[in-house]
Amino acid sequence: MDEFVERLAGIGVPALVFLIIMSTTGLTGAAAITATLALLGPGGMIGGVITLIVIGAGASVISKYGYSAIITATCKKIMQKDNLTQEQMCEKIDKYPITKGLKEKVKTKIREA
């Protein structure tokens, strides 16, 4: 079931982005598809297709691991790279524009490490 949800997110999010952009073009049919792909990415239609693939891959990874796991892993890498203590990293996390619940969850994971 988890793999199904992961695949669905990998397909659904790019499709949703595509439909939203397509609805803003005011065009229909092939012209709408062409205009949407050209608007989505750098380099015209090919860039748009690549952008949708990257969005799908990102959505798939996020659905597989979850936001908190990705943010926690990123914070641990920042701690190692910048040679920060747990307390310094927790202060840095408090400044991030994320929910209080997610901040507490990430800080707990950092303190456990």
Predicted segments — roles?
Residues 4-70:
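Small-residue-rich hydrophobic membrane-insertion segments
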Residues 64-113:
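Amphipathic, membrane-inserting segments
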